[in-house]
Amino acid sequence: MVRFKKSIFSLVGALFILGACSSNSASPESEPADEGEKESKETYTIGVTQLMEHPALNLATEGFQKAIEEAGIDVEYDMQNAQGDNSANDTIASNFVGQNVDLIFANSTPSAQAALSKTTDIPIVFTSVVDPVGAELIESMEKPGGNVTGTSHHHPDSIPKALEYLKNELGAKKVGTVYNAGEQNSRAQIDKIKKQMDEYGLELIEATVSTSADVKQATESIADQVDAFYCITDNTVVSAFESVADVATTAKVPLLAADLDSVPRGAFAAFGVDFFEVGHGAGEMAVKILKGEAKPADIPAEPPKTLKFMVNKKVADTIEVEIKPDWEAEIYE
């Protein structure tokens, strides 16, 4: 896409120059162009690699682009989506390296890992990553090192708040979750949940999937065993979130999500972050890098600043759960 745009620009430029030469030969007295008019603003190429299409990831990309726009930087984007295929992630990353893009924006853990496996020179800014240290993208949040930095979407209070709510407000004892064990992003969250389950007297009932096509059946397989569902930010499951929501609502089992964007899609409630803001933060980092103000190694990776609680009133009414004023929830109607 980027090369196609550049070839069109080159053709137009050539025609303009030919026209100008013809005009000058006919009018030798013509004034030369002002030097300022000859100067062109530098354009940067950013390769955008996103694991798949779903609202949370899409919002993160939009937030990233908004930050670039606000900075007034002239950018051409090469937008690529792996559609959930890890081999496609590798191909996309290799192509970006071959094009020698100025920066890679990697939206998801697998996308960032693929990019880092292909280059240690081109700056990489990630987002939508739960545990960037555990994913071996950076050395530490404070001092990333190497050519990578970015923003995590995992708020440190999200899991404790969710488990406390499931236990104390919903009275759950057995909590079901569906996830793709092949996603490092998901394994990190499940590990955190398991470490805290005993503290809240909860039992985790798991069902794993490989593709989005497996999600509905996996959810159905445990629906009659649980008091509530907790849907982590697993890309495979979130891409088919409506399947989880349909099963949970039909069974009148509360479905608590880990991202706010799942509430309009049928979750009963969510403790989550604004993915647009998370992506915007990554965009601000990219601006510093492109302007030469800082290197990725010197820009601390950031967790989200704000955790919000949202409840879907329609779903609450359907599953007959009363929304309590002391929840201080944002209500989606």
Regions found by a protein language model. Give the residues of each.
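An alpha-beta-alpha
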Residues: 46, 64, 149-200, 300-315
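Hydrophobic alpha-helical segments within soluble ligand-binding/sensing domains
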Residues: 132-174, 274-294
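Extracytoplasmic "Venus flytrap"
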Residues: 32, 37-65, 71, 78-87, ...
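Hinge/cleft segment of the Venus flytrap/periplasmic-binding protein
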Residues: 288-333
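Flexible loop/hinge segments that line or gate small-molecule binding clefts
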Residues: 114, 119-157, 257-269
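Bacterial lipoprotein signal-peptidase II cleavage site
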Residues: 19-38
